[in-house]
Amino acid sequence: GVSSTALLVSVLRRFGANPRFAVPRRSEDGYGLSSSAIDRALEPGRPDLFIALDCGTNSYEEVAYLRSRGIDVIVVDHHRSKEKHLEDGILINPHVHAAPGDAAWHNLCTVGLVFKLMHGLLKRLRSENNPAAFRIKLRDYLDFAAMGTIADLVPLQGENRILARHGLRMLQQTQRPGLRALMRVAGVKPTQGILPVDISFRLGPRINASGRLADAALSVELLLNEDDGFCNETALQLDAFNRERQDIERQITEEAERLVESHYANDHGIVLYGDNWHPGVVGIVAGRVSRKYNRPCVVLGNEGEMAKGSGRSVDGINLVEVLGTCCEHLSNWGGHPMAVGIALAKEHIDTFRAQFSEAVRRYVGGDIAEQELALSAWLPVEHIRERLMDELESLHPFGQANPEPIFGIHGV
């Protein structure tokens, strides 16, 4: 969402537009295109066009509300549709409009879709001889596209691989003050090359930290701002948020693992709730717990009368399909096969816990298989030469659906 907003706003500004942007605050608005987030976005005045990024596919009532006020709506999103399609507005979503599974753009995340949307806009305006359209080079925004693509853990295949590979090169030579300041505080040295791991574990967590603990708009401002002083100060602030996030995450993870060991070790799908758990970091905790115990996990935090949180899955278990069979007590939910956000009344947690575990059991048809170490190949020792290293280098960038090869060697 952050990289998508930065890319879209940057390009529109080059056309002389001055778009407002608003980022939902998790603590106040929850996830996605909520009514409170919309009201806050409309406070400065009614726009002619409202563009929802990385949310909105399932926001039927919210989009209808915007349309009722005479506002055109474009939804650019890659989350799965749960029941029906949007009846109002324009929806750009490759998972809704029957895209062939092998299409090069099928698994684009939202920033990739925004990149394509801007590509289409430039082509259209160039055909109309718009002078600004000829001055804008979309490759200058590949750094934003790469960051969002890698951080969102979409398969690095097809067009995602192209965006990531060329975007990483652009990121190495970026002159954006915000990105350069962020690299400095994160210890990323562009002169030594930038890898996906630098985004996943250094830059991405700092960009996301403000949204988890405060306001994600701060990260968007960092990416857009041209003032070195502001960018240096903001990068330090994001770094501080990230350190705070790590401390909170560590504490909740320890508590969550104790709960699993004492109460839910035999559940096929794990649902955990903590009254003092920060909703902004429970998704990371869910990922850690699911990896440790090799089963889907939902971790919930306290938000008034509601419990809100995130779920993470393991290979072979589609969380969207699982939740579709046990969602009767969920007031809101949605996401991807491997990651979802949910909300429900606290009184329904125990019932949902039992239903979720049973739904996972039915989905896998019994017990979840233990994960195995998947070797890419067995290699004779004499094949490990500089040429092999060069060939492996050509396979970069490694990431989701393009993992770094693991080789086995006999008789070492």
Residues of each region from the PLM?
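Hydrophobic helix-and-loop "lid/oligomerization" segment in the mid-to-C-terminal part
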Residues: 1-49, 69-70, 87, 123-351, ...
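Hydrophobic, well-ordered secondary-structure segments
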Residues: 5, 60, 111, 115-118, ...
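Hydrophobic residues within well-ordered alpha-helices
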Residues: 8, 114, 167, 238, ...
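A short acidic, often aromatic-flanked loop/helix-cap motif at beta-alpha or helix-coil junctions
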Residues: 28, 97-102, 382-384
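Active-site cavity-forming subdomains of large catalytic enzyme subunits
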Residues: 39, 43-107, 111-128, 132, ...
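A short acidic, amphipathic alpha-helical/loop segment
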Residues: 61-65, 270, 285, 391
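Two-component system phosphotransfer/interaction surface
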Residues: 118-119, 346-361
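A contiguous loop/helix-start segment that scaffolds small-molecule binding in enzyme catalytic cores
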Residues: 153, 173-176, 358-412
